[in-house]
Amino acid sequence: MRCLPVFVILLLLIASAPGVDVQPKTKYYVPRASRRDFAKKTPKRLSKLRGCCPRSFLCCR
């Protein structure tokens, strides 16, 4: 029964803690959707830079 008051106090402290993001959004933060779009656009950019070649698997997509 000694642990019950300590447990209640800990619950009250946790409940009153502010809801703050642990990891702040910095200039390096990239959402997952942007990563997917970047992965789709990269082969197109490479094919435009090098021109279309039949031996490369990244060309002409």
Curated annotation (Swiss-Prot):
Pfam families recorded: Chi-conotoxin (PF16981)
Domain statement: The cysteine framework is V (CC-CC).
Expression tissues: Expressed by the venom duct.
GO cellular component: extracellular region
Signal sequence, start to end: 1-19
Keyword Disulfide bond: yes
Family the UniProt entry places it in: Belongs to the conotoxin T superfamily.
Main location class: secreted
GO molecular function, one term: toxin activity
Official protein name in the record: Conotoxin Vn5.3
Localization (cell): Secreted
Prosegment location in residue numbers: 20-50
Post-translational modification: Contains 2 disulfide bonds that can be either 'C1-C3, C2-C4' or 'C1-C4, C2-C3', since these disulfide connectivities have been observed for conotoxins with cysteine framework V (for examples, see AC P0DQQ7 and AC P81755).
Keywords: Disulfide bond, Neurotoxin, Secreted, Signal, Toxin
Superkingdom as given in the UniProt entry: Eukaryota
